Structures are given as C-alpha cells and as structure tokens.
Amino acid sequence: MSVITFTIDGEQYSAKEGDSILHVAREHKIHIPTLCYLEGLSTFGACRLCLVEIEGTTKLFPACTTKPTEGMIVRTNTDKLKKYRKMIVELLASEGNHQCAVCVVNGHCELQDLAYDVGLDHVRFPYLYPEKTLDATHKDFIIDRNRCVLCIRCVRVCHEVEAAHVWDIAGRGIHCEIIADLNQSWGTSPSCTSCGKCVRVCPTGALFEKGAAVGEMQKERGFIKFIVNARTKREWVRVAPEDE
C-alpha cells in the first residue's frame, strides 16, 4: 500500500492510501469539529462542520470524506472556516427546538459543545420552530424529533451494526425527519431489537432513555468502533466455563 505525504496547517504528515484527511488529523491530535461523523460508522459528510481548505481551489471540502493526495496542502482553522462553522451551528440551532435548560443531555451534548467551540452566544437567523413529534411508545426509549440534527447516526448504526434498519429519513427541507420502519410508532416496530445503540450514538437529546432527568444522561459512543473492529477481526470468541 502506497504512502502519501501532504501538509496540514504547515506541517507534513504521511497517510496510507484511502485514509481521509479527518482520519490523519485525528491520528495527530489536530482538532477538526464534527457532528455526523462517528468512528466505526460509514462517512456521510452531511453536517459540513469538518470543512477544510485545500490550496489551489476556492471550494471547501469535508475532511471526513476527502482523501489526501501527494503534495496536497490543507488548512483546518482559517478565519473563513471559523466563520462557516459558526454559521452552520447557528443554522442547526435555528432549525430545531433546542432548549438546553430542560434537555436530558444538558452538559453532555455534542451540539452544545460545538456551540461553545465556535463561540456562539446568539443566533442571527430567525427560528423556524418546525412542528416535530415526540414518540414515547417504545418501552425503554423516547425519540424527540425537535432535538434531531439529522446526522443519521441512528440510521447508520441500526443498519450497519445492528442490521435491523429500523430508522430511515422521510420528508424534505424543514419537514425532513427520522422515521421508524414505514413511518409508524417506534413501539410498534417489528424490526427494533431494543438494543439501544441508536440512543447511545445520538449526539443530542433527540434519543434518550425513559426516566432520564435534565442533564442526567451521558452517552457512551466509543463502543461502536470496538464492535466493528472485533467483527472485522472475527474476535467473537466465547470461552466456556470449566464446569460446562
């Protein structure tokens, strides 16, 4: 496998053919903000928060899906990028109904963390207040579509890891939302295994456990990469107890 040498923020780095700019950046502790990306799941490139500049073009590229080429010069933290990222977080805030003070993941929310990172203290755009539904029909979990940012982590983890494909996307524009099966109540879904993976990978309070209080729920998202790695390496080995 060939090795590529390219530059990020003035420093030279090596990458294996097929690695993304984001993968190389994270390997070397270079911070590039993300929201839809989650290690272990397929890359989607929807949130656009990981946009980077590449010398020789005025176009911005998502670091999660862009592969470096030999001699490429990448910039990750310019004033232009900071402006774009702040605007993206503002738009996400204005398109949903994000009331942090009463959210179960207040203090543990990736969107909230991004707002701090980009220095967001107010939203310049008019709030749209879309009419979204809350589905509490599942015995263990709730989906509040008001807090959904359409990162589709839930769709991908359910399809790629659990292989149930309960979740999908319906609608257009501001009316776009996550649905269960053929747009039915989550609690009536025959596909759902109640594994909770979708709840764990959700970056906001859109998916949460029943009974969770304000600011109480902390989501563990790192387990996905371990499941995927173990499956790839065929490490699912059960050691039988001695008395069996």
Identify the function of each model-found stretch.
Residues 11, 43, 188-191:
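Short, conserved secondary-structure segments in the cores of folded domains
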Residues 13-70:
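N-terminal cofactor/phosphate-binding cores enriched in small/glycine residues
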Residues 9, 17, 44, 172, ...:
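Short glycine-rich loop/turn motifs that provide flexible caps or phosphate-binding loops at active sites
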Residues 48, 57-191, 200, 205-244:
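Fe-S ferredoxin-like electron-transfer domains
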